């Protein structure tokens, strides 16, 4: 058994989970707890980073498998959180917070998908900018 892939995922996951917790606490301190801003922020930021690094590390620079496992499966897998999104949405449903529920579902889904796309565009722009200066 090769330990490196498991270790890469474990370290990335640990850092991603701690980062998610930190971002969530910062969002609660900044905007309060009436809406799950922390979950929205980690999901959209994580989606942007996934799109960006998909182009930069996988498409352009062919990053090592262990680093891809560290970043995508470990860090971004733990940083973003579909389970928290689902649980918070269920709570809003059970409480009858219909506007918050619909907003949460739409903004998380549309926002996350959009941010993956924006991340790929930014990465391509950055790469083309570097190619043009050579």
Swiss-Prot record:
PANTHER family: FLUORIDE EXPORT PROTEIN 1-RELATED. It is found in: Cell inner membrane. The chain crosses the membrane at residues 7-27, 38-58, 69-89, 110-130. Fluoride-specific ion channel. Important for reducing fluoride concentration in the cell, thus reducing its toxicity. This is Fluoride-specific ion channel FluC. HAMAP family: FluC (MF_00454). It comes from Legionella pneumophila (strain Lens). Belongs to the fluoride channel Fluc/FEX (TC 1.A.43) family. GO terms for molecular function: fluoride channel activity; metal ion binding. Na(+) binds at residues 77, 80. InterPro entries: FluC (IPR003691). It is a multi-pass membrane protein. It catalyses: fluoride(in) = fluoride(out). Na(+) is not transported, but it plays an essential structural role and its presence is essential for fluoride channel function. Keywords: Cell inner membrane, Cell membrane, Ion channel, Ion transport, Membrane, Metal-binding, Sodium, Transmembrane, Transmembrane helix, Transport. GO terms for cellular component: plasma membrane. GO terms for biological process: cellular detoxification of fluoride.
